[in-house]
């Protein structure tokens, strides 16, 4: 089982959608928002996680310098235009990606 930290702006829609999809296939996942997570909390979660997945390419620049590049991944779903974590368009992006990671035993 891999441990995932998923991050979007608020930690309520895009990152939650990915975290739920990962949990659905037996992985551990915690969703956070960069706007509402204190730096010390974020560092603690990064230390716990095998992978830190940001939901938009521009969020890579928000990562503290000490986040290992080996943990950082991008699943760019764009700006939050979805409004809720189970939005059909968002799920058509997230679920196939999780399925592809599962085929690789979550070595992403």
Task: Please identify what each model-predicted range represents.
Residues 1-108:
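Short polar/charged helix/loop
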């Amino acid at each position: 089982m891999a441990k995932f930290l998923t991050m979007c702006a608020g930690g309520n829609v895009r990152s939650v959608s990915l975290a739920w999809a990962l949990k659905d296939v037996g992985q551990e996942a915690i969703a956070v928002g960069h706007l509402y997570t204190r730096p010390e909390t974020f560092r603690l979660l990064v230390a716990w996680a095998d992978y830190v997945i940001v939901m938009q390419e521009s969020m890579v620049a928000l990562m503290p310098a000490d986040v290992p590049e080996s943990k950082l991944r991008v699943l760019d779903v764009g700006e939050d235009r979805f409004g809720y974590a189970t939005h059909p368009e968002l799920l058509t992006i997230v679920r196939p990606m999780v399925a592809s990671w599962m085929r690789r035993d979550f070595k992403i």
